[in-house]
Amino acid sequence: MANDLISRREVLSGAVGAIAGLAATKLGLDAAEPSAKRIPIGLQLYSVRQDCQKDLPRVLEAVAKMGYEGVEFAGYYGRSAKELRKLLDQNGLRCCGTHTGLNTLQGDALAGTIEFNQTLGNPYLIVPWMPHEKLASVEACKKTAQVFNELAEKVKEKGMYVGYHAHAGDFQKVGDQTAWDLFFSFCSPEVVMQMDVGNCLAGGGDPYASLEKFPGRSKTIHLKEHGGPAGACIGEGQVDWKRVFQLCETTGGTQWYIVEQEAYGQRSPLQAVQRCLENLKKMGK
C-alpha cells in the first residue's frame, strides 16, 4: 500500500473536509440494514480508489451492475452526503460502512460525522488505521479501548456503531496475546470488530480463532484473500472461506460481507473486484 498514489490516510484526510461542509439533512439509517437472513455483499471502494477519483458515478454504476449490494466508503471524493446518497439510490446500493479517521469521531467533529453518515444511511463508523503506539502495550490497548467504548456510547443513541479495522501489524504479540485480541478484550461488545481476513493472516494472526473468541462482534467483515498467485482474488488463495462463512453466519453476528481487493495481477481493479464477486457467488454467497 505504501506505493499507492493515494494512501488510505490521504483519503481519510479528504473525508474530514466533506463532513465539515455537510448541511443538516437526516434521512435515517434503514438503507444500511439487510432485509433478509442472507448476508449481503458490499465493496470497500478503496479497492477501486483511482477509478473513483476519475469518475465516481461510473464506478458506482459498474459495481451495482456486477451485483454488489452496498459500498463502504474510504473518502468521499469531494462530494457532499446528499450527492453521495443520491448516487447510491440511483444505483440501488446501500452504504454498508465508512472508513473514517479517529479524529473525525472526537470532539466537535463527531456531530458532523454522525450527521454525514445519517444522510448516507450508514450506521458503521470504522476506524481503518491507528499509529502503532495506540496498541503497543497492555496499558495502551486499555486506554485506546476506553476511547472506543466512550464513542460507542455516544453514537448508540443514534443507532450507530464505531469499530476498528484489522491491519497486519495488529497481530503482533503484546505479552501472550495479539494486540488485536487484547484491544478487543478491553472493548465493550458495542465496538465492531472489523476483521480483515487477509490482513490478519499476513500479520501471522488467526482470523478463525478471533471470530470464535469474540462472538457477535463482527457486524461487518472484510473478505480479502491471502496467499496464492500474484493478484489472487477471493477463493484463489489459502483462506478457508468455508470456515470463515460458517463462523460469520453462526457466531459472528455478521450483517455485511465486504470485499476489499488490493492486489490485481494482470487485471484492472474493476475486473478484480468483479472476479471476487463471481467467485463468492460460486461459493453460494
Task: Label every PLM stretch briefly.
Residues 78-83:
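Active-site-adjacent beta->alpha loops and helix N-cap segments on the catalytic face
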Residues 41, 69, 96-97, 123, ...:
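A short, local hydrophobic-aromatic micro-motif
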Residues 16, 23-24, 69-70, 77, ...:
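Active-site acidic/histidine proton-transfer and metal-coordination neighborhood
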Residues 2-5, 9-42, 48-64, 174-192, ...:
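Histidine-acidic metal/acid-base catalytic patches
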Residues 43, 162-168, 221-223:
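Histidine-centered catalytic micro-motifs
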Residues 46, 76, 103, 130, ...:
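Flexible loop residues that form catalytic
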